[in-house]
């Protein structure tokens, strides 16, 4: 073996050893990477981050599958089903899942039904309590109603007592209850039951009253007008009509008040009646035109002191009403001012009473011009309030500007923490100064 062969063999051996060592290092690195973290005070559980156990997250954490989260609140009904929002929309028929209304009524309540031989062109949105197929007309039964027409000739059968031997046709079983789990009553459930009800004309719906079978009331209009009225009601009825009746339709006074009654009767209530009271209620009642002697008799009872001096001999005091013990000059008690048929005269009498009493008792009144300005005044006429107000307006903006000025004899690299603290304190106090400014502005506006 030559030296070159020895050298090549050694080189291949070194390469294979290097490759083995590289694989060992890779395996060693993988094994060390898969090891669980050691137990310590900060990590008491040695469950690593790569474990296959699911992470139990809080419910507020957003995930990529929000459909598995629970709802934050219970799903309420639509607002149009409970509250009337004023939108007159066409009423949708009830869903197929809802149980039929006629199947749970007593026998006497079912007396009003359809004639199976005649089909009336009533809109599908007329009666929301009957189950129907939304694709077809609600009362258009077609050939299905004619299949069992021999059972409709006044047999007196009710809904809940049906004959057991009913001839079924394949047309009646378009969709059986067992074939469609979403429609447990079947698409022709109401049609099969309505065929066995004795034929009577469809009633006109009246205003629904509580504990009243007015829905099954006999029609009060001729049959020629029924369809017109029904179509009009169907186009104008709102969605929330079955659950919420508008109280404004059934009240005497349609008003926006919360109890649906006006605080005062309407003005037409007093239109053609002279004996009814005036709708404008005065402050006090004057039964008849008073004469001066009765008022002077009352004045002797209510005047202060038993002896009437010469200064108040011409005055009289009313014993009741809003004027109380206010001294009233006798010459102002004019019969034209105390007439009860006009409120303007009463108002004029009131103003004349007050004006005369102010003239008589002028010494007891305070001159408002004496206290028009603030009492505390300096010699130069500038009040303390104006000084403080001006100080509060001018000083805080200057403080703000001073707080943003650089600190002298300091460079950027020489700034210390105390400088930052002092600048922050400056700005906080400046903001407080702005608040004080607005405080003084409010005081000035209110004062």
From Swiss-Prot:
Residues 300-321 have a biased composition (Low complexity). It is a multi-pass membrane protein. It is found in: Membrane. Residues 11-32, 61-72 have a biased composition (Basic and acidic residues). Residues 1-80, 115-184, 295-322 are annotated as: Disordered. It comes from the Eukaryota. The chain crosses the membrane at residues 385-405, 424-444. Residues 42-51, 115-158 have a biased composition (Polar residues). Disulfide bonds: none annotated. Coiled coil: none annotated. Keywords: Membrane, Transmembrane, Transmembrane helix. GO terms for cellular component: membrane. This is Uncharacterized protein C405.02c.
């Amino acid at each position: 073996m030559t030296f070159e062969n020895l050298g090549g063999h050694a080189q291949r051996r070194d390469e294979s050893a290097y490759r083995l060592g590289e694989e060992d290092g890779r395996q060693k690195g993988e094994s060390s990477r898969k090891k669980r973290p050691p137990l310590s005070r900060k990590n008491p559980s040695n469950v690593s981050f790569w474990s296959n156990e699911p992470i139990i997250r809080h419910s507020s954490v957003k995930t990529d599958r929000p459909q598995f989260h629970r709802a934050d609140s219970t799903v309420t009904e639509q607002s149009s089903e409970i509250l009337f929002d004023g939108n007159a929309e066409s009423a949708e028929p009830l869903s197929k899942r809802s149980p039929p209304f006629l199947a749970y009524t007593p026998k006497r309540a079912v007396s009003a039904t359809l004639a199976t031989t005649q089909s009336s062109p009533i809109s599908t949105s007329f009666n929301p309590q009957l189950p129907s197929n939304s694709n077809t007309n609600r009362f258009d039964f077609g050939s299905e109603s004619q299949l069992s027409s021999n059972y409709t000739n006044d047999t007196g059968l009710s809904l809940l007592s049906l004959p057991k031997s009913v001839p079924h046709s394949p047309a009646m079983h378009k969709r059986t209850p067992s074939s469609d789990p979403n429609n447990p009553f079947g698409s022709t459930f109401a049609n099969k039951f309505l065929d066995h009800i004795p034929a009577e004309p469809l009633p006109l719906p009246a205003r629904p009253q509580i504990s009243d079978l007015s829905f099954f009331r006999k029609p009060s209009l001729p049959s020629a007008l029924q369809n017109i009225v029904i179509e009009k009601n169907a186009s104008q009825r709102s969605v929330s009509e079955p659950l919420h009746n508008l109280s404004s339709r059934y009240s005497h006074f349609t008003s926006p008040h919360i109890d649906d009654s006006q605080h005062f009767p309407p003005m037409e209530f007093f239109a053609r009646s002279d004996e009814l009271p005036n709708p404008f209620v005065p402050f006090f009642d004057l039964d008849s035109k008073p004469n001066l002697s009765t008022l002077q008799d009352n004045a002797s009872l209510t005047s202060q002191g038993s002896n009437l001096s010469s200064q108040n001999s011409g005055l009289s005091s009313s014993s009741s009403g809003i004027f109380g013990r206010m001294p009233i000059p006798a010459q102002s008690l004019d019969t034209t001012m105390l007439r009860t048929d006009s409120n303007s005269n009463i108002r004029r009498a009131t103003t004349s009473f007050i004006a005369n009493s102010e003239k008589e008792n002028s010494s007891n009144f305070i001159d408002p011009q004496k206290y028009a300005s603030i009492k505390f005044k300096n010699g130069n006429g500038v009040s303390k309030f104006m000084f403080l107000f001006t100080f509060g307006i001018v000083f805080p903006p200057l403080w703000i500007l001073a707080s943003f000025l650089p600190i002298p004899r300091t460079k950027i690299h020489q700034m210390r923490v105390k400088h930052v603290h002092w600048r922050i304190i400056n700005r906080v106090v400046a903001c407080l100064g702005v608040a004080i400014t607005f405080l003084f502005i409010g005081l000035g506006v209110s004062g």
